[in-house]
Every structure is written in C-alpha cells, then in structure tokens.
C-alpha cells in the first residue's frame, strides 16, 4: 500500500482547510502495553517482579491513556480553529501488517504540511521513541521547516537536546494545554503564510 496525501485526506473527516494536513505524534503508542499483552496476561503479571523501565509502563498506564486523550483534544481544537486537517496515525487506518508503524510515521510526515511531536510529562522521562527518531533522520533536512517538537516543561531528555542540535529542530515548551494548543495554532498559521508567500512549497 502506498501512503499519499490523497489517501490521508480521503480517510479523514472534512474541515475548513482539508488540504492542510497536520500530523500529531505522541508517546502513547510506543509505551502502550495493550499492543503487546492481552488483558488476561497483564492481570497475571506482578508489577514488583518487573525491571524498572517495564514497571514504569505498568504503573503509568493511566498517564499513557491520558497522553493519547491529550492528543485527541488537541486534534479537535486544531480542526475547529483554524480548521486544519489535524490527524493521528490511527485515523488513517493503515494496517501495520501492510506498512510498519515507523514507515507510516515517515510517510505521514512527508505528506503533511506540518508535523508536531507532542511530549507530555508522564511522571518520568522517556526518549521521543523510535518513530520520531526515524522521522527526523529521514526528513529533517528536507522537511525541517514543517516540524516542531513541543514538550511539557517538566520533561527533560538528552534526546530532545541532541535532536535540537543535530537536526536544528524547532523545540517549544508548554505548561498548560491551552498554551500547547496556542503554540500549535501559531505554528500551523506560520506555515500557511509561508506557503502563500512562496517561502515553502505548496504540497498540492
């Protein structure tokens, strides 16, 4: 299966700016044990027997679900105002048996007018994950102006710092959800203006 702008637009609901695709990435999927274990298997595991990093995953399931819910709320805000076609990878509904998750993320970023990596504080620090790293490695040089990394002010990560230096990545912080939404709206608006002026190529 080939992931294209047309495929993405076709699978998303309609908004004012259907052709302005804003891909939202977050840490929820990489750390969600539902992808690996059944409910029965999770119930049988004694959390105290697990090594530290895995113990964190089990203890913070609610926070991981909240991270996904946060992305959904942000998506709704951006689709309402300014009306851009904000989406999560799950919305395009491409089976990972057909295209693996990392390749999907790279292609969604390549097809999108804007991409944001959103990293809330989950009670501990994780890296940005394999998908984000692969996206940056593949597309930072050609799509760097369309990428932003926004993390909650409590998040400290060596990978974020190195990504900023290595790929000249735009990094923003936020303290409240309202501030996060405002920054993403400004980012989308800035890209729209640059496309209209011809500073950035139009993708259609």
Can you annotate each of these PLM segments?
Residues 1-204:
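Conserved catalytic or regulatory cores that recognize and/or transform ribose-phosphate-containing ligands
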